[in-house]
Amino acid sequence: MSNIEQTLSIIKPDAVERSLDNEIKEMFKNKGFNIVKDKKIQIAKSEAEQFYKVHETKPFYNDLCAYLSSGPIVVMVLEKENAVLGNRELMGATKPEDAAEGTIRKKYGISIDKNSVHGSDSVENAKIEIDFFFKD
């Protein structure tokens, strides 16, 4: 029995600013992901605060929210078997210098903050995050 899942991926401002969104989308497609929905948007800091609410008590929370709302982002719903784990593997470690060769963050990430992509960390959070950006 297949385990087709959906997950949310965000191409963050640093990557969009460098016009890497199409290259990153190709990386997903080459790994068998179907991009079900995608849109380029700019969110307000208050929306970023709501999105990252789970990190509210962490010291990096304000910087994270300011960064996500600092420029256009591309939000996508990705679908494939075991999509959540597959996306996490393709993104690579949070710190680009710790990420494995061939991962998005190793290839395009600048720093722990400007690491080019976000991905849902669980099936449950994927549902919540997809609903956050695609309420239809």
Regions from the PLM with identified roles:
Residues 1-136:
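Non-catalytic terminal and connector segments of soluble metabolic enzymes
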